[in-house]
Amino acid sequence: MKAAPPTSLQALIEALRVLPGVGPKSAQRMAYHLLQHDREGARKLGDALRGAADHIRHCARCNTFTEQEICETCLDDRRDGSILCVVETPADQIMIEQTLTYRGKYFVLMGRLSPLDGIGPKEIHLDRLLARATDTEMGGPVGEVIVATNFTSEGEATAHYIGEMLKARGLKVSRLARGVPVGGELEYVDAGTIARAVMDRRNL
């Protein structure tokens, strides 16, 4: 009879597999490492995951992660409310913030269009983006929307869809310049390249 890990250990391995890029073997190595070498780290990890899952929500205006109803960026009156930058993920938002060149507001899609995966306009909250860009109660109307989706095929398709949707409402829409490589994702691009792409953005 084949020996199996204890039930609680197997549950940990399966839980670790939800992480991107983590397969069965990687999850098993992580689980064994935590239990063999870093029990205190394992407890801290569990507490941090539980705390984040219980307290992190989506900002009512920009859809990013926050512990409040409205995030600090949206509440910051020093930022330029006439410019709205649309990104795929909170990680992309952080990358643009690190350039120290953009002082407008954001909207975070939490994804990108991918019909083959069942991800359409509703799943990436384009109805909320439209409201954010045009509704005065949500902080609109804005003077310009910068589409900063990634330069993957899905990101380009998402940018095109957003551009057509917002231009139909009379809004100015621009796209990051091609300083970001084709197929590139903002999360993995250096801050200087992103800064140049923002400054050299082009109209859609």
From Swiss-Prot:
Keywords: DNA damage, DNA recombination, DNA repair, Metal-binding, Zinc, Zinc-finger
Record GO biological process: DNA recombination; DNA repair
Residues covered by the Toprim domain: 82-181
Molecular function (Gene Ontology), one example: DNA binding
UniProt cross-references to SMART domains, sorted A to Z: TOPRIM
Keyword Zinc tagged: yes
InterPro entries: DNA_Rcmb_RecR, Rcmb_RecR, Rcmb_RecR_Znf, TOPRIM_dom, TOPRIM_RecR
Superkingdom to which the source organism belongs: Bacteria
Name of a matching Pfam family: RecR_HhH
Zinc finger regions, C4-type: 59-74
UniProt record similarity statement: Belongs to the RecR family.
Role noted for this protein: May play a role in DNA repair. It seems to be involved in an RecBC-independent recombinational process of DNA repair. It may act with RecF and RecO.
Listed name of the protein: Recombination protein RecR
Gene name linked to the record: recR
